[in-house]
Amino acid sequence: IERWFWNHATSAGWYGATVVITPERIDEALQGRGLNWLEVEAFQTAIGNLPKTESAEIITDACDVDANRFTQRIATGLSDWPWHNSTLVSEHKADEIYPVVAMASILAKEERDRAMVQMSESHGFNVGSGYPSDPTTKAALHRLVLQNGIDEQVRWEWATTKRFWKQNRRGDVPVRGRKSSVQQRLFHEDESRIS
């Protein structure tokens, strides 16, 4: 379907842009302003990469409980907004209402799937889909979340990563950008002696 979209985009007057957000940037957002602001910035970048056309209708899937606030935050960061006779609207579940937003969701999913394949190839083993329910992804954590650190291509702030660390590694869960604490447990609760 992705190929179909791009084959018909020009003649139909459709535009699309994807923005790749690295695990590091997601972790930094979680430590800082939060995911809502990261998503606002990503939409600003994607919209900024679109051709500036007259009478454009831009619809986003609201990533904020307040859809109007999400729209305003995006618009505020666009240096050349508003475009002539154009609208920018955010709605919850827009991918269920507007086919164009559903297509954008498919394009993003295809991009994510390619990134997971590239990660598997660069590591030399299958890391799965990257979703917490995927047994292959869970199994890959044994090779990606090591005692001496977490792989750079993994979201360190991901609840699945943190849970895996707490169940399988010692000490505090590492925080990206900070050196590991020198204070690590010297022994496990089930050991009566210091090792």
Show the residue positions of the predicted features.
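RNase H-like, Mg2+-dependent phosphodiesterase core
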Residues: 1-195
